[in-house]
Amino acid sequence: MHEAQTFSSTPATKPQYPLQRFSVAPMLDWTDRHCRYFHRLLTKQALLYTEMVTTGAIIHGKADYLAYSEQDHPVALQLGGSDPQALAHCAKLAEQRGYNEINLNVGCPSDRVQNGRFGACLMGEADLVADCIKAMRDAVAIPVTVKTRIGIDQLDSYEFLCEFVQTVAERGECEIFTIHARKAWLSGLSPKENREVPPLDYERVYQLKRDFPALTIAINGGVKTLAEAKEHLKHLDGVMMGREAYQNPGILTQVDRELFDPNAPVVDSVKAIEALYPYIEQELSQGAYLGHITRHILGIFQGIPGARQWRRHLSENAHKPGAGVSVVEEALALVSPSYYESVGG
C-alpha cells in the first residue's frame, strides 16, 4: 500500500527552491481531492492546488470544501471572494486544517465569478485586493498569494500591471504572485476562450520579475513541456502548469528529477496506478463512485500503445453499478505488454 507523503509547512532548514517552483494549476471541476491524490503519486515536489472555492461555500455550505488527503502536501487552497473579513476567516480555517498556502483568485473571467465580485474583475480594484490580502496575512502565518492576469479588457498596459502588483505588494504585503501571461476579456469570451484567444506575453512577466526582483513570481499559461518550464525558470521563480498536467499527467512523473533533484527517481505510471488501488477501495467503501476517480487518470498512458483501449475501457465501465478496482485492473492489462513489462509489471 502506498504510504502517505509528509511535507512540513515549517521545515527545519530553508528549502532549496520556493514552494511555487512547479505547481499544478487550480482548475474548476478538475483538481478535486481525487485528482490531487493521484497527482501526488506522480510527484512529491509539485505544489498542488484545490479547485477555486468561494468564501460563501466554505462559510455557509453543507459540504466540507476544505477536505483533502494528508498525502496532498504541499497543497494550496484557492479562494474566490472579495470580502476581507470573510477571506480572513476562511484562510484561518484552512490554516487550521493544515494547508500550506492560501491563494486569491484574481484571474478567472467567467460571468458567474464576476457577478460574485471576484476573479479577474478584481484587477480593476487593486486597493480592494490589497485589503483582502492584508486581512488574510494578518490572520495566518502561511503564505498568502495572488493568481492574476497581465491585464483585463482595455486595462492591459505594462504600467497597469506594475501598478496593480506594486499596490498589492506594498499595501497588501503580498510577496508571491502567479501571473497568467494573457489578458482577460471580461465580456465577449468564454472562460475557455480566455485561456486560448488572448495572446501569450511571457516577456511581460519576465520584465515584471526584473522590475520587482524581491517578489516571488511564477508564470502560468500555455506551458506544455518540462523543457518549456526550465526555460521559464531561467527568468522566474516558478512555473504553473494547467491543462497539460491534467490531460497528460505522465508529464508529472518527470517533475521531481527534471526540476528539483537530478537523483530523484522517475515514477513509473503502472506502479502509480497500482498504488491507487487502496485509495479507490477506501473511497468506494465510503460511497464514492469509481468514475469520479478514474476520470482523472484517463491520460496517464498518453502516447503509449494501448492508451486508447485503456481510456475506452474506463470510460465505458467505470460508471456501471458496482464498478470497482477490477475495472482499473482490466484496463491496465490493455496497455502495451512491452511497456508494462519494461516497468516491472
From Swiss-Prot:
Coiled coil: none
Transmembrane segments: none
EC number: 1.3.1.-, 1.3.1.91
Pfam families the UniProt entry points to: Dus
CDD domains assigned to the protein according to its UniProt record, in alphabetical order: DUS_like_FMN
PROSITE patterns per the UniProt record, alphabetical: UPF0034
Catalysed reactions, semicolon-separated: 5,6-dihydrouridine(20) in tRNA + NADP(+) = uridine(20) in tRNA + NADPH + H(+); 5,6-dihydrouridine(20) in tRNA + NAD(+) = uridine(20) in tRNA + NADH + H(+); 5,6-dihydrouridine(20a) in tRNA + NADP(+) = uridine(20a) in tRNA + NADPH + H(+); 5,6-dihydrouridine(20a) in tRNA + NAD(+) = uridine(20a) in tRNA + NADH + H(+)
UniProt GO MF annotations: flavin adenine dinucleotide binding; FMN binding; tRNA binding; tRNA-dihydrouridine20 synthase activity; tRNA-dihydrouridine20a synthase activity
Annotated site, Interacts with tRNA, chain positions: N105, K192, R195, R308, R311
Cofactors that this protein relies on: FMN
Family note: Belongs to the Dus family. DusA subfamily.
HAMAP family: DusA_subfam (MF_02041)
Function: Catalyzes the synthesis of 5,6-dihydrouridine (D), a modified base found in the D-loop of most tRNAs, via the reduction of the C5-C6 double bond in target uridines. Specifically modifies U20 and U20a in tRNAs.
Protein name: tRNA-dihydrouridine(20/20a) synthase
Source organism of this protein record: Yersinia pestis
